[in-house]
């Protein structure tokens, strides 16, 4: 069966213009206009998605099948083009019968054209085919528009769902344009309103605990590189070669479709001298569909600039991914559980804003893993927030899992974060020695987020930095009173 893409090529129907009109209409819809005004950070993210929409629409039109009736009419039209005028006169009754049988829009006009002329001349033969072709172009264009309208409705529905999700989560997870873009990419999954409301709930809890939020931000900045510029900078001349498009074309670079009369191909120019094809020539001229030579040129020139010689002293500490281990023992339930989950959500926000990865591991009697910064990050975050903290404490397994992850090339510069009350048994000597080796040889940093003032000092001594957030009633009341 004939595909719509083939039909468009046969009739020189440009679907690109139709696709662009549809996308412009979609972006100008009232729903998107209101959304862009409310969430300006997400506007750029949605705009960056336009090439994907355009490619999906092209594939849809390319794979679409033409209805059998229109296919049969197109085949008949192609066969009629090969007939001479005497042959066309003989075949005309069968052609008219076929058009009526197929309910072609051209059938009635074709009969009127034939009835209005007693003799079928060569000119009438050409006119008949030209008008028939125009009818086929109209039918093909209508079919393109119908398919694009269906796709527009489906695309608008998808975008509205993603806008609802992104709009709810943008205040919680999007701290800048980078985070907004990654959040929009994550919203492509199949999520229901009740699912992502869990993220909203913990986001609101995090806003109620500004000290916890600040703690996460301090931890995220703890590896920020420092640079000290010198003030005695001198100017130096710097030369480079730059390539620029030439003002005068130099050579033929190929063929293109345009309305440039001066660079027409000879076959195109020949059609202008044929009376029967003159109308076709002007139509293609208006639509910029004439085949012309493409001329390009380029030139190189030397560009001289002066720039200061800047010397800086760097204390380089790259900000890598987060590997977060969360204690899910029974002692971490209740308010501790809420704080641990909200803290991980704050780290996810930092990771999205700074284009870092955030990997969560829950440790008790077994290790459960989630990556909150991947393409399925929102779904992974929802699964993590749905977990209940009712297991045991196995810090040794937690550290072994972290060390195994740090040996991977993609995690070599990661920050390891352990969230616990640290009320547990002492670590085995082999684990302690391995952690110290990673700290000494590979400069890995281990952070402890202590949720209790009663954590064992012997366990916590192994960490590079201890971030304390006491969740006891006295500390909670003091924090609330200070606000």
Swiss-Prot record:
Primary location group: cytoplasm
CC per GO annotation: cytosol
Domain of life: Bacteria
Keyword Chaperone attributed: yes
Pfam families (UniProt xref): VWA_CoxE
Keyword Chaperone applies: yes
SUPFAM superfamilies named in the record: vWA-like (SSF53300)
Localization annotation: Cytoplasm
Residue ranges crossing the lipid bilayer per the database entry: none
Described purpose of this protein according to its UniProt entry: Component of the RavA-ViaA chaperone complex, which may act on the membrane to optimize the function of some of the respiratory chains. ViaA stimulates the ATPase activity of RavA.
Subunit and partners: Homodimer. Interacts with RavA.
Protein name: Regulatory protein ViaA
Species of the source: Escherichia coli O127:H6 (strain E2348/69 / EPEC)
